[in-house]
UniProtKB/Swiss-Prot annotation:
Record-given protein name: N-acetyl-gamma-glutamyl-phosphate reductase
One Gene Ontology cellular component: cytoplasm
Catalytic activity: N-acetyl-L-glutamate 5-semialdehyde + phosphate + NADP(+) = N-acetyl-L-glutamyl 5-phosphate + NADPH + H(+)
Location in the cell: Cytoplasm
PROSITE patterns, A to Z: ARGC
Coiled-coil zones: none
Naturally occurring in which organism (per UniProt): Ectopseudomonas mendocina (strain ymp)
Length: 344
């Protein structure tokens, strides 16, 4: 049984980890931390977990206690894992970080986008970017895994087949993405209030979103060179979900793009390439650890439109983190994640 610790268990990604791990036959949550809620039982804060964690309570983060775990998940704001990851790694504990702390390979680039110096630049070289569809082999032997963000997951999975095949004009990519309000986290903010977000949709961070350098970094690796990407995120009046509409111009219109995507993801348990002409819906992935993709070439021209949908809290965060844990410990990566999405 894998002994699990969770740092930052009161946010949406934290409770989603708890929900998923409650169904996992090979993992046991031994420690969950929260400075503000120390002493409170988990099922008192989250009644959906009643009957699953009858004795588990939040505690103040303690390196010695966390270091006794086999793996520790960080479901925290950026900057927190910087301070603790090194000590946990020294204790022999593996770290899976759901925050942005170790996603970017360049400490100066991270500081530019996150507004503070990187707190553990010495760990960046060994951090493995936890996108299993790209880095599965590296994940198997990692000590420190950086779980991709939600927008980066949906966008990269949608564009990687085109870039790997050298078919897309890498200098003119567009990602037009929509997110549910849970992507903003559980902290109170005016923009997340029901009366503000309901019955409305808006673009934000058009000048530059923090996920932009992460997406570019991954697409550069797939393309084998620089990419030009316009990324525009939008907030939509739904709780969960990412819908990415991705645009790329192809250099060879004779290629069967449906076959290309089907072959690229044929052995990926959590990527569903839908039949030609499909339009994936966010509701079809709600609560599930799956990315559904459809590829279109309108009017048979050189412009390709890829539609990619995920649940931002599952494949875009906690589900992908559990998928990484499964790979890391040599388990079937579908373990605890094979449930169907919720409909309606």
């Amino acid at each position: 049984m894998i002994k699990v610790g969770i740092v930052g268990g009161t946010g949406y990604t934290g409770v989603e980890l708890l929900r998923l791990l409650a169904q996992h036959p090979q993992a046991e949550v031994a420690v969950i931390t929260s400075r503000s809620e120390a002493g409170l039982r988990v099922d008192e804060m989250y009644p959906n977990l009643r009957g699953h964690y009858p004795e588990l309570a939040f505690s103040v983060p303690d390196v010695a206690t966390l270091g006794a775990c086999d793996v520790v998940f960080f479901a925290t704001p950026h900057g927190v894992a910087h301070a603790l990851a090194g000590e946990l790694l020294a204790a022999g504990t593996r770290v899976i970080d759901l925050s942005a702390d170790f996603r970017l390979q360049d400490a100066e680039e991270w500081a530019k986008w996150y507004g503070q110096p990187h707190g553990a630049p010495e760990l960046l070289s060994e951090a493995v970017y936890g996108l299993p569809e790209v880095n599965r082999e590296a994940i198997k032997t990692a000590r420190l895994i950086a779980v991709p963000g939600c927008y980066p997951t949906a966008t990269q999975l949608g564009l990687i087949p085109l870039l790997e095949a050298g078919l897309a004009d890498a200098g003119s990519l567009i990602a037009d993405c929509k997110s549910g309000v849970s992507g903003a986290g559980r902290g109170a903010s005016v923009g997340s209030l029901f009366c503000e977000a309901g019955e409305s949709m808006k673009a934000y961070s058009v000048k530059g979103h923090r996920h932009l350098p992460e997406i570019r970094q991954g697409l550069r690796l797939a393309a084998g060179g620089d990419v030009g990407l316009t990324f525009v995120p939008h907030l939509t009046p739904m709780i969960r979900g990412i819908h990415a509409t991705l645009y790329a111009r192809v250099t060879d219109t004779s290629v069967d793009l449906q076959a290309l995507f089907e072959q690229r993801y044929a052995n990926e348990p959590f990527v569903d390439v839908m039949p030609a002409g499909s339009h994936p819906e966010t509701r079809s992935v709600r609560g599930g650890n799956v990315c559904r993709i459809a590829v279109h070439r309108p009017q048979g021209g050189d412009l390709v439109v890829v539609l990619s949908v995920i649940d931002n809290l599952v494949k875009g965060a906690s589900g992908q983190a559990v998928q990484n844990m499964n790979i890391l410990f040599g388990l079937d990566e579908r373990l605890g994640l094979s449930h169907a999405a919720l409909l309606p």
